[in-house]
């Protein structure tokens, strides 16, 4: 418990001085304490900050660009200033990536699977979120959450995670506004067209939940965050389920989807 408190104090510092390269929820409200049991915090003492999603007792899914040296993982956190009795801390034992040197596929390879150094115990504030059983539908209302910035122009982060509802759009909309995106991709396009609500610095790696299913990983946003007509980009989890399941089953040399 002493270690948890030390790490929690570090997290408070990170939320105050988080790097500008992370992502945060703009235009959202404080999450209910019971709706983010799978949300984890990835951070280190140098100021890096990201979210992630617990998918079973031993594995966390996040964005590849959230990889950082000396990574610490906190689970069961609601308030950075008030310790939950069931908060748990873990270190990464192994990290798995889908790296690509192909410009047409590097956009959608921003995914990292982390094996924890020891299993997590389910509790009141900690529970995994299962992988999706089917892909999401365009038009779905989806939920985002994280400790990212709540004001795009300020480097302040909330004490508790913020949540917001956004809409899933056709991929072609994001391709039209983000230069260099390929014709086909394993990326989801989601946001609010009028702007003002969306992921931002500090939210990277966190979940996109559509109709109760874990469908996306926060990957990239407009600059500034939640800009009108510029939805954010999310890695499509469904397309990687076979890769993820193979690694969990012990096949760590499995090939990523093309």
UniProtKB/Swiss-Prot annotation:
GO terms for molecular function: serine-type endopeptidase activity; toxin activity. Keywords: Disulfide bond, Glycoprotein, Hemostasis impairing toxin, Hydrolase, Protease, Secreted, Serine protease, Signal, Toxin, Zymogen. Pfam families: Trypsin. One of its GO terms (biological process) is proteolysis. Expressed by the venom gland. It comes from Trimeresurus stejnegeri (Chinese green tree viper). InterPro entries: Peptidase_S1_PA (IPR009003), Peptidase_S1_PA_chymotrypsin (IPR043504), Peptidase_S1A (IPR001314), Trypsin_dom (IPR001254), TRYPSIN_SER (IPR033116). The active site is at residues 65, 110, 204. GO terms for cellular component: extracellular region; secretory granule. Residues 25-249 form the Peptidase S1 domain. Disulfide bonds join 31-163, 50-66, 98-256, 142-210, 174-189, 200-225. Glycans are attached at residues 44, 103, 121, 251. This is Snake venom serine protease CL2. Belongs to the peptidase S1 family. Snake venom subfamily.
């Amino acid at each position: 418990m002493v270690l948890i408190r030390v790490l929690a104090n570090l997290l408070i510092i990170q939320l105050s001085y988080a790097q500008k390269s992370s992502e945060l929820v703009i235009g959202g409200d404080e999450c209910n304490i019971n709706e983010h049991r799978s949300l984890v915090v990835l951070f280190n003492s140098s100021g890096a900050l990201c979210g992630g999603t617990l998918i079973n007792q031993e594995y966390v899914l996040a964005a590849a660009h959230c990889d950082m040296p000396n990574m610490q993982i906190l689970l069961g956190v609601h308030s950075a200033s008030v310790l939950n009795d069931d908060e748990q801390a873990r270190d990464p034992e192994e990290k798995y990536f889908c790296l690509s040197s192909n410009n047409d596929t590097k956009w959608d390879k921003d995914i990292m699977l982390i094996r924890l150094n020891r299993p997590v115990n389910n509790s009141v504030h900690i529970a995994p979120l299962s992988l999706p059983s089917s892909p999401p539908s365009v038009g779905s209302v989806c939920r985002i959450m994280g400790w990212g910035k709540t004001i795009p122009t300020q480097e302040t982060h909330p004490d508790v995670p913020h949540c917001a509802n956004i809409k899933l759009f056709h991929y072609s909309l994001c391709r039209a506004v983000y230069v260099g995106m390929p014709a086909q991709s394993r990326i989801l396009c989601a946001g609010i067209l009028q702007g003002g609500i969306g992921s931002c610095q500090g939210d990277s790696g966190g979940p996109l939940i559509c109709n109760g299913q874990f469908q996306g990983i926060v990957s990239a946003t407009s600059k500034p965050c939640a800009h009108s007509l510029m939805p954010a980009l999310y890695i499509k989890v469904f397309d990687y389920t076979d890769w993820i399941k193979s690694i969990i089953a012990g096949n760590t040399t499995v090939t990523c989807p093309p």
